Regions:
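Beta-strand-dominated lipid-handling architectures at cellular/organellar boundaries
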Residues: 1
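Outer-membrane beta-barrel transmembrane domain signature
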Residues: 4-18, 22-29, 38-43, 51-55, ...
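N-terminal carbohydrate-binding/catalytic regions of secreted carbohydrate-active enzymes
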Residues: 33-34
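Amphipathic alpha-helical scaffolding segments comprising HEAT/armadillo-like alpha-solenoid repeats
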Residues: 59-61
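A short, structured active-site edge motif that brings together acidic residues
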Residues: 63-68
């Protein structure tokens, strides 16, 4: 069994702090997630799915998942995690469709990052997201990322819409086990 605990701390364009907490566990070919603040503020979600991986030089994994959310937003969803690693290049995307129980409009979330490991511990990249939590004026937020790894601990700073007035920042800290 392996897993991680991650905290993401965002600062919105109106200087409001937004925390997101994620716990992930992998057991054999199964992936489990518990998240707080990801689908909406003050909302908890749980997800489970099967990991399908293939490739050696180019390693790819696909994880279709189902889940639910309770809190400010209550609903069920379907999601997909995608990861590709090729040498020093990493591409990652997580997407989900959440269908609220109250009959309000469904919501599609997506978050992705592409990075290049220039040193064993350092990886700059680009990121894109569509999250309800940040409520920015843009439908899709584009940005840059700068990450560092020190053993099992990693930290990444994301800057979304860095060249306009809707910019916001996010710090992600993750501990793997």
């Amino acid at each position: 069994m392996s897993g991680y605990v991650a905290g993401y701390f965002g600062l919105t364009p109106d200087d409001e702090a937004v925390p997101i907490v994620v716990v992930g566990l992998d057991h054999k070919s199964w992936h489990f997630l518990a998240r707080y603040g990801y689908e909406d503020r003050d909302t908890f979600s749980a997800w489970a799915g099967r990991i399908f991986g293939f490739g050696d030089q180019v390693a790819v994994s696909l994880t279709p998942m189902v889940g639910f959310a309770v809190g400010n937003t209550d609903g069920i969803g379907a999601g997909l995690e995608f990861a590709l690693d090729w040498g020093r290049l990493s591409v990652y995307n997580e997407s989900e469709l959440l269908i609220p129980f109250d009959g309000s409009e469904s919501w599609f979330y997506a978050w992705g990052n592409t990075s290049y490991r220039v040193a064993d511990w350092f990886q700059p990249g680009v990121s894109i997201q569509r999250l309800r939590v940040f409520q920015s004026e843009r439908e899709v937020d584009r940005g840059i990322s700068v990450g560092a790894e020190f053993g099992r601990l990693s930290a990444t700073v994301y800057g979304y819409n860095p060249f306009n007035e809707n910019r916001f920042w996010q710090l992600g800290v993750e501990w793997g086990f």
